[in-house]
């Protein structure tokens, strides 16, 4: 149910940017307050990304007030912070459906709104896209402006600097807003800097600056002296030298919660030529005390009552697979100081908080730099250390070349703990772990494991830790484990060997991963044999031969794309054995899986027990 908009009188007049731009500037602070209040209650009712959006309220208001969106292009990096943008661009009354099946998308999405000029979800893409749009705008000669908004966390990714380096060379008109909400670049915030930013972006300063460049053209010594003098004067109060060296004109830092200062500065910058960067300082979770104190904990929230100032206590459940991994990592690190944990800025999500605290010298946060994280692991392995790279399936895509070139090619023993394999649910198509089994299967020297429960997960992680002949991967899903009684003793599994879990007849179901419980339920109804294959690569050749010889039909089940996945490996093996037979492959279809509750999606894809049974019976009919 949408909120009563009558409680937000100014926001009620700004359902679209066109309406927003009709408001007098004097009411923008009130609009920002109402927008923040609406966001607070809306996410409380729907769940979703929370703290980031609270920090970008004033920025969002200013951007849509100054720029003629959607004609002017506005690109958000990642998109966690774009909830206020969605509210102001005609989706206010649908915010209660965000991240839900059939509801609005969790991130900016081109198919959803003309105001979402570039679909996002992963970090570091906005400046590349903005540069391309700026080049296109210049060719079009229609006066279109281009703005990208990127957080300081995303600035750790190499793609960002690749794009900035190119933008500085091409020198097209574009604005990059650096939303610095971690104080990681500068703490020089206050009235002086706000005033300086407006001064530096004003016509007088920019005219003098550009005129000086023209006058000094062809006089390299004097030009260099003038440049250094300018940088020295600016550098006393602003940290812009790095951006200037990349070819950007740097403005800031300014208070990102002063909507009037943002509007005036952006108005000044709107018609500046060349690439510009506006550095703003914001507070993640702004306006809600618990989120301000713990922005990481309040990054994303379930449904909650904002008036309690507490997130609802989670119901007692089984540990998550991430927690199972984190405990295992601590257990082995206690006994082996060569064990190193690496994460690309996903410490909390990957279950590595305790490890980072107990073993700080063995913990490495590579920041949002997946390529670097993978090759960092390769380098450690070269020196006889035991690197464990904890990474989400969707983010390993970004380190694929490094997986091949830097790890597998050299047969380096790097263990990949791949979290969020399969359906992740509410974050949608940018985050579903649909492809990892497919893209890893093709890589020589890889060993790939898919546990059916938390005990197998621990044993497989230990197997990867013990394996020294090349890289290993253990792939597990998001969310709670199965509740299997924990076996503390860790034993390395025989490589490439599966288990028969149920003996049946005619139909043999080969399970890869945590859908085993549903497969066993379907197997009971069919009186089918069920095998827990454990290894996606290498496959258990002898077991598959045995099952093929003793059954009429094989069925493969995996929470991965059918194309190129584990089932494809079974088909390839049967062809090599010259033993063709009916094989039904069940898994994710050849499409990007939309957002929604994980259970709902699994059921819709017919990968729950009832759906698996239905698909097999239909195939046999």
Curated annotation (Swiss-Prot):
Entry EC no(s): 2.2.1.7
UniProt KW Metal-binding keyword: yes
CDD domains cross-referenced by the UniProt entry: TPP_DXS (cd02007), TPP_PYR_DXS_TK_like (cd07033)
Reactions mediated catalytically: D-glyceraldehyde 3-phosphate + pyruvate + H(+) = 1-deoxy-D-xylulose 5-phosphate + CO2
Pathway stated in the Swiss-Prot or TrEMBL entry: Metabolic intermediate biosynthesis; 1-deoxy-D-xylulose 5-phosphate biosynthesis; 1-deoxy-D-xylulose 5-phosphate from D-glyceraldehyde 3-phosphate and pyruvate: step 1/1
GO BP field: 1-deoxy-D-xylulose 5-phosphate biosynthetic process; isopentenyl diphosphate biosynthetic process, methylerythritol 4-phosphate pathway; terpenoid biosynthetic process; thiamine biosynthetic process
Cofactor note: Binds 1 Mg(2+) ion per subunit.
InterPro entries listed in its UniProt record: Dxylulose-5-P_synthase (IPR005477), THDP-binding (IPR029061), Transketo_C/PFOR_II (IPR009014), Transketolase-like_Pyr-bd (IPR005475), Transketolase_BS (IPR020826), Transketolase_C (IPR033248), Transketolase_CS (IPR049557)
Residues at which Mg(2+) binds: 152, 181
Record key words, sorted: Isoprene biosynthesis, Magnesium, Metal-binding, Thiamine biosynthesis, Thiamine pyrophosphate, Transferase
Example GO molecular function: 1-deoxy-D-xylulose-5-phosphate synthase activity
GO cellular component assignments: cytosol
Gene3D superfamilies (UniProt xref): 3.40.50.920, 3.40.50.970
Cofactor(s) the protein requires to work: Mg(2+); thiamine diphosphate
UniProt superkingdom: Bacteria
Binding site for thiamine diphosphate: 80, 121-123, 153-154, 181, 288, 370
Protein family per UniProt: Belongs to the transketolase family. DXPS subfamily.
Record's subunit section: Homodimer.
Reported function: Catalyzes the acyloin condensation reaction between C atoms 2 and 3 of pyruvate and glyceraldehyde 3-phosphate to yield 1-deoxy-D-xylulose-5-phosphate (DXP).
PANTHER family: 1-D-DEOXYXYLULOSE 5-PHOSPHATE SYNTHASE-RELATED, 1-DEOXY-D-XYLULOSE-5-PHOSPHATE SYNTHASE, CHLOROPLASTIC
NCBIfam families linked: dxs, PRK05444.2-2
Record-given protein name: 1-deoxy-D-xylulose-5-phosphate synthase
Species annotation: Shewanella woodyi (strain ATCC 51908 / MS32)
Lineage: Bacteria, Pseudomonadati, Pseudomonadota, Gammaproteobacteria, Alteromonadales
């Amino acid at each position: 149910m949408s909120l009563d908009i009558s409680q937000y009188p100014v926001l009620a007049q700004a359902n679209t940017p066109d309406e927003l731009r009709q408001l007098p500037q004097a009411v923008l602070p009130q609009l920002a307050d109402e927008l923040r209040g609406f966001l607070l209650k809306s996410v409380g009712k729907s769940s979703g990304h929370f703290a980031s959006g609270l920090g970008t309220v004033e920025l969002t208001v200013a951007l849509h007030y100054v720029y003629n969106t959607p004609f002017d292009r506005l690109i958000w990096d990642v998109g966690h912070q774009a909830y206020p943008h969605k509210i102001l661009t005609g989706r206010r009354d649908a915010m209660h459906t965000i991240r839900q099946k059939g509801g609005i998308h969790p991130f900016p999405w081109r198919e959803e709104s003309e105001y979402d000029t570039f679909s996002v979800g992963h970090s570091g893409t906005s400046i590349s896209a903005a540069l391309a749009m700026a080049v296109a705008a210049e060719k079009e000669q229609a006066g279109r402006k281009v703005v990208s908004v990127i957080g300081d966390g995303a600035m750790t990714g190499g793609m960002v600097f690749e794009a900035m380096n190119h933008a500085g060379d091409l020198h097209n008109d574009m604005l990059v807003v650096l939303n610095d909400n971690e104080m990681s670049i500068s703490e020089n915030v206050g009235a002086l800097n706000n005033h300086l930013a407006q001064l530096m972006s004003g016509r007088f300063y920019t005219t003098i600056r550009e005129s000086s460049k023209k006058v000094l053209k062809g006089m390299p010594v004097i030009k260099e002296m003038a440049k250094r003098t300018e940088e020295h004067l600016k550098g006393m109060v602003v940290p812009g030298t790095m951006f200037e060296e990349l070819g950007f004109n740097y403005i800031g830092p300014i208070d990102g919660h002063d909507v009037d200062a943002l509007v005036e500065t952006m108005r000044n910058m709107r018609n500046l030529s060349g690439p510009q960067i506006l550095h703003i300082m914001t507070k993640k979770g702004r306006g809600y005390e618990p989120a301000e104190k713990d922005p990481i904990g309040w990054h994303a929230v379930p449904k909650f009552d904002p008036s309690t100032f507490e997130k609802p206590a989670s119901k007692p459940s089984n540990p998550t697979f991430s927690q199972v991994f984190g405990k295992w990592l601590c257990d082995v690190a206690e006994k082996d100081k060569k064990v190193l944990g690496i994460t690309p800025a996903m410490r909390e999500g990957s279950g590595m908080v305790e490890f980072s605290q107990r073993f700080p010298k063995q913990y490495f946060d590579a920041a949002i730099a997946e390529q670097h994280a993978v090759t960092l692991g390769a380098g450690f392995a070269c020196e006889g250390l035991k690197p464990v790279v904890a990474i989400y399936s969707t983010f390993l895509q970004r380190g694929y070349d490094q997986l091949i070139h830097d790890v597998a090619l050299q047969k380096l023993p790097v263990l990949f703990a791949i979290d969020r394999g399969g359906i992740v649910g509410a974050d949608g198509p940018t985050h579903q772990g649909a492809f990892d089994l497919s893209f890893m299967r093709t890589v020589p020297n890889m060993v790939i494991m898919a546990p059916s429960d938390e005990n197998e997960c621990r044993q497989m992680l230990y197997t990867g830790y013990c394996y020294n002949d090349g890289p290993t991967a253990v792939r597990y899903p998001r969310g709670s484990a199965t509740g299997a009684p924990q076996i503390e003793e860790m034993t390395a599994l025989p490589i490439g060997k599966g288990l028969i879990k149920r003996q049946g007849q005619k139909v043999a179901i080969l399970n890869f991963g945590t859908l085993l419980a549903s497969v066993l339920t379907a197997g009971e109804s069919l009186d089918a044999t069920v095998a827990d294959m454990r290894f996606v690569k290498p496959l258990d050749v002898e077991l598959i031969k045995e099952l093929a010889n003793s059954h009429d039909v094989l069925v493969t089940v995996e929470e991965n794309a059918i194309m190129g996945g584990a089932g494809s490996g079974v088909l390839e093996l049967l062809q090599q054995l010259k033993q063709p037979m009916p094989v039904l492959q069940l898994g994710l279809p050849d499409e990007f899986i939309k957002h929604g509750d994980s259970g709902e999606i699994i059921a819709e894809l017919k990968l729950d027990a009832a759906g698996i049974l239905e698909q097999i019976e239909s195939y046999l009919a």
